[in-house]
Amino acid sequence: MSEVKYKRVIMKLSGEALAGDKGTGINPPVIQKVAEELRDVHDLGVQIAIVVGGGNMWRGETGEQLGMERVQADYIGMLGTVMNALALQDSLESLGVPTRVQTSIEMRQIAEPYIRRKAVRHLEKNRIVIFAAGTGSPYFSTDTTSALRAAEIGAEAILMAKNGVDGIYSADPNVDPDAVKFDELTHMDIIDKGLNVMDTTASSLSMENNIPLVVFNLNQAGNIKKVVAGENIGTTVRGEE
C-alpha cells in the first residue's frame, strides 16, 4: 500500500452530487467520474465504505407539499438511496472494482441485508461496501447513518464529499461574500456555532466516538485521493478538543 493517512474510511456521498448540474436523477458522466476516483483510491489499498444519500431522487419537501406523513416520506427517501447505491455499484464493477451493497431494509433480491461483521469482512477482502436505506428507521438522516456506520466498522475518518463546496464556511459563500472558510474545527464547534454541515445527532455520534470528519469538494479531480493521503484540503473536523 502507498503511504496513506486513513486506511479505512466512510465516504458520505450525497444524492445531489450524483445528479451534478442536472439537479435530479443520476448524471452518467458524473457517477462514472466518481467511480473512477474511488477506483484510484481503492487501488492504494484503502478500505472504502460509502453511505449514499437520496436527495436527487426524493426530497422531504415534496412529501410536505403532498401532506404526507414524515415517516412515509422518509421511507421513500430510503428507497431513493438504494437506487443510487445500485447505480454506483454498477459503475464501480464496470471498472473491475468488487463492490457489495448492503441495505438497512431487507431486499434480498437486489442487495445484502446490513450485517456489521459481514461488511467488515468485505472491507478486509478489499471490496467496496455501499450502505443504503439509511439506518432503516425514519427521522434519521444519512449523515447520522455515516456516523453510525463509521463507529460500527471502525472507520478512521468520515469523508464528506460536497458538490462544488470546498469546505465548511461561517455562512453560505454563494450568498454571503464575507463568509469565512474554516480549515479546522471540532465537532463541538459545529454544534455550538450551528454550522450547516451535518445534523446534531451525527455530530454528537462522531464526537463521542472520536471520528474525524473531512469536508471537501468532490468536483475537483483527485480530491478523494488527496484526503486519504492526509493532504490539507477542505475542512477537517477533529473528533475531540
From Swiss-Prot:
Gene Ontology cellular component list: cytoplasm
UniProt catalytic activity: UMP + ATP = UDP + ADP
Compartments, record wording: Cytoplasm
The keyword Thylakoid is assigned to this record: no
UniProt-annotated binding residues for UMP: 54, 74, 135-142
Keywords recorded for this protein, A-Z: Allosteric enzyme, ATP-binding, Cytoplasm, Kinase, Nucleotide-binding, Pyrimidine biosynthesis, Transferase
Enzyme Commission number(s): 2.7.4.22
Pathway(s) served: Pyrimidine metabolism; CTP biosynthesis via de novo pathway; UDP from UMP (UMPK route): step 1/1
Regulation: Allosterically activated by GTP. Inhibited by UTP.
Region (Involved in allosteric activation by GTP): 20-25
SUPFAM superfamilies for the chain: Carbamate kinase-like
Annotated InterPro entries: AceGlu_kinase-like_sf, Asp/Glu/Uridylate_kinase, Uridylate_kinase, Uridylate_kinase_bac
GO biological process: 'de novo' CTP biosynthetic process; UDP biosynthetic process
Residues the entry annotates as binding ATP: 12-15, 55, 59, 163, 169, 172
GO molecular-function terms, A-Z: ATP binding; UMP kinase activity
Highest taxon of source: Bacteria
NCBIfam families: pyrH_bact
Function: Catalyzes the reversible phosphorylation of UMP to UDP.
Subunit-structure text: Homohexamer.
Record-stated family: Belongs to the UMP kinase family.
Protein's recorded name: Uridylate kinase
